[in-house]
UniProtKB/Swiss-Prot annotation:
Residues 91-130 are annotated as: Domain II. Belongs to the DnaA family. Residues 131-347 are annotated as: Domain III, AAA+ region. Residues 348-467 are annotated as: Domain IV, binds dsDNA. It comes from Escherichia coli O157:H7. InterPro entries: AAA+_ATPase, Chromosome_initiator_DnaA, Chromosome_initiator_DnaA-like, Chromosome_initiator_DnaA_CS, DnaA_C, DnaA_dom, DnaA_N_dom, DnaA_N_sf. This is Chromosomal replication initiator protein DnaA. Residues 97-111 have a biased composition (Low complexity). Oligomerizes as a right-handed, spiral filament on DNA at oriC.
């Protein structure tokens, strides 16, 4: 028995798990096999607890299937075993950076060449403008299924910057919490190392700084500034589109930071490869570390966000009122918080209690607009156009995959985005039974966890229907 056993486990886990989960939780593990014990080393306690909780049965099952009664005992520890680290070759390129890209990736400096996070020096001139908002922390970020992986990845980076998830690329629609997580990482890093040089900025600020540097003949100072930070957090990287000189400079900055094991975190409103106007060499580098999506929050998370926001404002928000608002406003966190602020302001001005009837009155124009925008008819037309089929196909009895999957998607969206009951949704889809609708909703929920494509389709359609 040898470490090839762990490589076999890796190959199977890669097939069984979504790519993001595999890259985030399994890839960082290091393995050591001795005395019929397979020790798996996690980079920190957070990863160890997560893997043991979520994947212990998967791994034990694979060991038994490969070895039968001779399967080794499994042991988890926090630490590193560099000589037995999970081989990169053990997994295929749909999770790692593509082989042809990996050949061009700059060689990262060995840990011994940079004291880095174990000995962050005192800030030097010029003074670094952190721009990190101290109000945005992990503690006040409401976690749900839609953002669980993104939060976990950000937490990992805050605890171990410059480590396995470098760069970290977060993407999703407007107002879903990407910026909050950027600031939370910055605050987490500086809480651990107060002298760390952490810089947060919008991508347009990088462009503006570069233009000023060119105008003032100070491009070398510009390069030194950005290439000497310990963590660079850039929001809305899609604004680099069609700015060739900015992309050129960021390309070299990116390489320099990666070589120095300095952390990079980027956000965008879309998947890296879908960003138009950005060079392929940059888009490929964006995917070298870990890419995680943030989806629109599900109902339970929307309710939790409203309750937490109300609590922060010392406002008692009845649960049924939070549910009423969350059920009708679905697009993003910013919209939810804006609606709640409006309700609170109206309550303060009028002195009235916050009830469902009061909310209906305070948000009447917003609620009317939402109900006008999202109807089952609109969902059917949007889904049919997205999948390049006819609305009549969605209502038909056809069961081919090319029709059945879009039909299930449309039903799931109708349940998520409208207030119609399951029987009403079934009637709108050719008189189908409510159990068919329930099955469709559960199937799409399952596929969103297993398939990147289905997850992307759902997010894209939600974004289109909510805009």
């Amino acid at each position: 028995m040898s470490l090839s056993l762990w490589q076999q486990c890796l190959a199977r886990l890669q097939d069984e798990l979504p790519a993001t989960e595999f890259s985030m939780w399994i890839r960082p593990l290091q393995a050591e096999l001795s005395d019929n014990t397979l020790a798996l080393y996690a980079p920190n306690r957070f990863v160890l607890d997560w893997v043991r909780d979520k994947y212990l049965n998967n791994i034990n099952g694979l060991l038994t299937s490969f070895c039968g009664a001779d399967a080794p005992q499994l042991r988890f520890e926090v630490g590193t075993k560099s000589v037995t680290q999970t081989p990169q070759a053990a997994v295929t390129s749909n999770v790692a950076a593509p082989a042809q890209v990996a050949q061009t990736q700059p060689q990262r400096a060995a840990p011994s060449t940079r004291s880095g996070w174990d000995n962050v020096p005192a800030p030097a001139e010029p003074t670094y403008r952190s721009n990190v908002n101290v109000k945005h922390t992990f503690d006040n970020f409401v976690e749900g299924k839609s953002n669980q992986l993104a939060r976990a990845a950000a937490r990992q980076v805050a605890d171990n910057p410059g480590g396995a998830y470098n760069p970290l690329f977060l993407y999703g629609g407007t107002g879903l919490g990407k910026t909050h997580l950027l600031h939370a990482v910055g605050n987490g890093i500086m809480a651990r190392k107060p002298n760390a040089k952490v810089v947060y900025m919008h991508s347009e600020r990088f462009v503006q700084d570069m233009v000023k540097a060119l105008q003032n003949n100070a491009i070398e100072e510009f390069k030194r500034y950005y290439r000497s930070v310990d963590a660079l957090l850039i929001d809305d990287i899609q604004f680099f589109a069609n700015k060739e000189r900015s992309q050129e400079e960021f390309f070299h900055t990116f390489n320099a930071l990666l070589e120095g094991n300095q952390q990079i975190i980027l956000t965008s409103d879309r998947y890296p490869k879908e960003i138009n106007g950005v060079e392929d060499r940059l888009k490929s580098r964006f995917g070298w570390g870990l890419t995680v999506a943030i989806e629109p929050p599900e109902l339970e998370t929307r309710v939790a966000i409203l309750m937490k926001k109300a609590d922060e404002n010392d406002i008692r928000l009845p649960g049924e009122v939070a549910f009423f608002i969350a059920k009708r406003l679905r697009s993003n966190v910013r919209e939810l918080e804006g609606a709640l602020n409006r309700v609170i302001a109206n309550a303060n001005f009028t002195g009235r209690a916050i009830t469902i009837d009061f909310v209906r009155e305070a948000l009447r124009d917003l609620l009317a607009l939402q109900e006008k925008l999202v109807t089952i008819d609109n969902i059917q037309k949007t889904v049919a156009e997205y999948y390049k089929i006819k609305v009549a196909d969605l209502l038909s009895k056809r069961r081919s995959r090319s029709v059945a999957r879009p039909r299930q998607m449309a039903m799931a969206l109708a349940k998520e985005l409208t207030n119609h009951s399951l029987p009403e949704i079934g009637d709108a889809f050719g008189g189908r039974d409510h159990t068919t609708v329930l099955h469709a909703c559960r199937k799409i929920e399952q596929l969103r966890e297993e398939s990147h494509d289905i997850k992307e389709d759902f997010s894209n359609l939600i974004r289109t229907l909510s805009s």
